[in-house]
């Protein structure tokens, strides 16, 4: 097997230029500078054309699509906001109308109940006044009956007392007038 590393006949071990002189770095060589500028210009023009024809339209389309999507979303959000504002206003109007109706119903019911209560109170007062008048008549007739009974009892008692004390029966008219005078005064 042959040694493949550096021992072949006629092969130089290094790629250096002979004479110990080193060549300058290729991009800095003056004789290739113009051709390098042309190559660089061609590469940049090709890169510009490729990016402007292929990559930039895709990026521009993506940006435009995103912008359109954002604008559409903003428009939809504004539409929904306007609808919700309109619904809120309609709700507030309905709520105010419902409050007004509830207050009117409450006032009407209150007035109706007050009128019914006044009617019932007046009817009750009439019944109570009639019962009171009947009771006063009953009391007056009972008092009159009781007073007439008291006069009779007082007259009988006075007659019995005078008879016991004097032993003689007093005059009934005289005893009745004395009892009447003592009851008045």
Swiss-Prot record:
It is a single-pass membrane protein. Signal peptide: none annotated. One of its GO terms (cellular component) is plasma membrane. Coiled coil: none annotated. One of its GO terms (molecular function) is proton-transporting ATPase activity, rotational mechanism. It holds the Pfam family ATP-synt_B. Residues 1-24 are annotated as: Disordered. Keywords: ATP synthesis, Cell inner membrane, Cell membrane, CF(0), Hydrogen ion transport, Ion transport, Membrane, Transmembrane, Transmembrane helix, Transport. InterPro entries: ATP_synth_b/b'su_bac/chlpt (IPR002146), ATP_synthase_B_chain (IPR050059). It comes from the Bacteria. It is found in: Cell inner membrane. The chain crosses the membrane at residues 34-56. Belongs to the ATPase B chain family. F(1)F(0) ATP synthase produces ATP from ADP in the presence of a proton or sodium gradient. F-type ATPases consist of two structural domains, F(1) containing the extramembraneous catalytic core and F(0) containing the membrane proton channel, linked together by a central stalk and a peripheral stalk. During catalysis, ATP synthesis in the catalytic domain of F(1) is coupled via a rotary mechanism of the central stalk subunits to proton translocation. Component of the F(0) channel, it forms part of the peripheral stalk, linking F(1) to F(0). The b'-subunit is a diverged and duplicated form of b found in plants and photosynthetic bacteria. F-type ATPases have 2 components, F(1) - the catalytic core - and F(0) - the membrane proton channel. F(1) has five subunits: alpha(3), beta(3), gamma(1), delta(1), epsilon(1). F(0) has three main subunits: a(1), b(2) and c(10-14). The alpha and beta chains form an alternating ring which encloses part of the gamma chain. F(1) is attached to F(0) by a central stalk formed by the gamma and epsilon chains, while a peripheral stalk is formed by the delta and b chains. This is ATP synthase subunit b 2. The gene is atpF2.
């Amino acid at each position: 097997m042959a040694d493949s590393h550096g021992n072949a006949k006629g092969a130089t071990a290094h790629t250096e230029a002979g004479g110990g002189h080193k060549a300058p770095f290729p991009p800095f060589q003056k004789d290739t500078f113009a051709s390098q500028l042309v190559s660089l210009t061609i590469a940049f023009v090709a890169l510009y054309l490729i990016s402007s024809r292929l990559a930039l339209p895709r990026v521009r389309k993506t940006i435009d699509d995103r912008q359109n999507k954002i604008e559409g979303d903003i428009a939809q959000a504004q539409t929904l906001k306007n609808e919700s504002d309109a619904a809120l206003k309609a709700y507030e109007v309905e709520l105010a109308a419902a409050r007004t109706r509830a207050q009117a119903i409450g006032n009407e019911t209150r007035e109706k109940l007050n009128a019914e209560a006044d009617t019932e109170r007046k009817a009750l007062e009439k019944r109570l006044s009639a019962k009171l008048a009947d009771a006063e008549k009953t009391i007056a007739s009972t008092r009159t009956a009781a007073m007439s009974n008291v006069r009779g009892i007082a007259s009988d008692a006075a007659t019995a007392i005078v008879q016991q004390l004097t032993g003689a029966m007093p005059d009934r008219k005289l005893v009745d007038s004395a009892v009447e005078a003592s009851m008045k005064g």
